[in-house]
Design a protein with these regions (language model features):
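Cleavable N-terminal export/targeting peptides
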Residues: 1-28, 175
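Short secondary-structure boundary/capping segments within folded domains
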Residues: 24, 41-44, 53-57
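Transmembrane beta-strand segments of Gram-negative outer membrane beta-barrel proteins
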Residues: 24-40, 101
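Extracytoplasmic loops and strand-loop junctions of Gram-negative outer membrane beta-barrel proteins
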Residues: 34-38, 114-118, 150-153
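Solvent-exposed loop/turn segments connecting transmembrane beta-strands
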Residues: 39-48, 75-81, 97, 155-162
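Gram-negative (and chloroplast) outer-membrane scaffold detector with strong preference
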Residues: 53-132, 137-143, 165-175
Length: 175
């Protein structure tokens, strides 16, 4: 009788372990967040950056993203140009428990609110391509924090580059 109970218990345990679980995929999930950090550009100095972004989970591994970044450049003179960029892109993410590394490609528009400094490779307005990487940490299903590194290059001039490093926080919903 004891042997039968043991076999039944082990069999029930194995069946429970083999049963399908609910997936925690993130397709159709919305993200809304912001970030603060620094920006650096060719011919410009390290300066503050502020960003806002939205993302939508196309699948459990791909997000569509829209990002707006404001940069307050300081060039060591009275002329301190501010810049805005709006980028749209697709990111591939690798969900690993609470840590989510990701990488994305972007295309968008870069605009200096004032004319860029003389001798700078930047135009006042330009189309840009970008590459971004990040590491997010899920505090909860709804809240996350992370770090983002993004490199943008203006299409009109190959040496017109910009680099952002941001600490981010986001709210998620809609799964």
């Amino acid at each position: 009788m004891r042997f039968a109970a043991l076999v039944f218990g082990v069999g029930l345990s194995l069946a429970a372990l083999a049963a399908p679980r609910n997936a925690d995929a993130f397709e159709r999930q919305w993200h809304l967040g912001g970030g603060v950090g620094v920006a650096d550009g060719k011919g410009l100095t390290l300066s503050p950056a502020l960003a806002a972004y939205a993302a939508y989970g196309l699948t459990d591994v791909f997000d569509a993203r829209v990002e707006v970044t404001a940069r307050g450049y300081h060039v060591g003179s009275d002329h301190n140009p501010n810049a805005l960029s709006t980028m749209v892109g697709v990111a591939y993410k690798l969900d690993v428990l609470r840590w989510v590394p990701w990488a994305g490609v972007y295309a968008g528009y870069l605009a200096f609110l004032d004319s860029p400094p003389k001798g700078s490779p930047f135009k006042q307005r330009d189309v840009a391509l970008g590459l971004g990487v990040g590491l997010d940490y899920g505090i909860s299903r709804q809240l996350g924090v992370g770090v983002t590194l993004r490199f943008d290059e203006a299409l009109s001039h190959s040496s017109a580059t910009n680099f952002d490093a941001l600490l981010r926080a986001e709210y998620r919903w809609g799964w």
